[in-house]
């Protein structure tokens, strides 16, 4: 299991808990996410 997969899974789980499962895993641009180690290029 790569660290990127863990990161994406953690972020997806975070989004489902906060916004609901319908929300894309990319956080909304209302506020920054400074704790992210990097910004995925999508």
UniProtKB/Swiss-Prot annotation:
InterPro entries, alphabetized: Statherin
A GO CC term attached to the entry: extracellular region
Region described as Hydroxyapatite-binding: 1-6
Reported tissue expression: Secreted by parotid and submandibular glands.
Source superkingdom: Eukaryota
Region (Hydrophobic): 18-42
UniProt region (Disordered), positions on chain: 18-42
Main location class: secreted
Keywords from the named record: Biomineralization, Phosphoprotein, Secreted
List of residues that carry Phosphoserine: 2-3
GO molecular function: hydroxyapatite binding
Keyword Phosphoprotein: yes
Record field: compositional bias (Pro residues): 24-42
Official protein name in the record: Statherin
Source lineage: Eukaryota, Metazoa, Chordata, Craniata, Vertebrata
Gene that specifies this protein: STATH
